[in-house]
Amino acid sequence: MYEQHVVVTTKHGQMPAFVACPDGAGPFPPIIFYMDAPGAREELRNMARRIARHGYFCILPDMYYRLGTVLFDLPRRTDAMSAVIRASMNSINNELVTDDTSAMLGWMDANDRVKPGPVGCVGYCMSGQYITTVSARFPHRMVAAASLYGVLIVTDQPDSPHLLVDKIKGELYYAFAEHDAGVPGHVIPDLRAALAKTDVKNTIKIFPGTQHGFAFAERADYETVSAEQTWADMFAMWDRCLK
């Protein structure tokens, strides 16, 4: 497998990213991996490698680059660390991530290992909002977007991602935990209602008995069967839309 740490120039600075793809010349269909709130780490790089082994070029950006190098030792997580994670999460928003996505698309367009044209993406936790937003902002590029236990997809703010779904041309996949304090009870019905007014092909699943984070193998709430089902669902969508 080919893998490398790269730097993508954005409107706001230099954004480090990890990339992985199969050995060989390619080109390979691209997947953007938007991180969860605790940030870029080896656990996510291993997940990016899994995507690459399936025949994709995966790019995992460090979305906290504006803050410098931010790393969290999650096994030693404390209340103070959680507060810093929340502050880091709040340092970015839909517009900033849209800017970063534009930069990544340009970077990939200039990379010979990346297949030109349609792009897939996945976002965990805080990035559920972002995969929805970028699918609307780049409707002719983002053709297959997945969200796992995504938060802030439906809010009362004017930039709430669910208000943009009528602009999406690609396919959407949302996997929610049954128990998730970050997803109030109105979110899934409101998201379903917004999508029902469009022609967007979408799948919304709620995985019984799961908690937020159920697809992260290093979390206490990891659920193998549900996690593997999300992988199967995502690969089926990406293969259908990108290969």
List the predicted regions and their residue ranges.
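N-terminal cap/leader regions of alpha/beta-hydrolase-fold enzymes
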Residues: 1-243
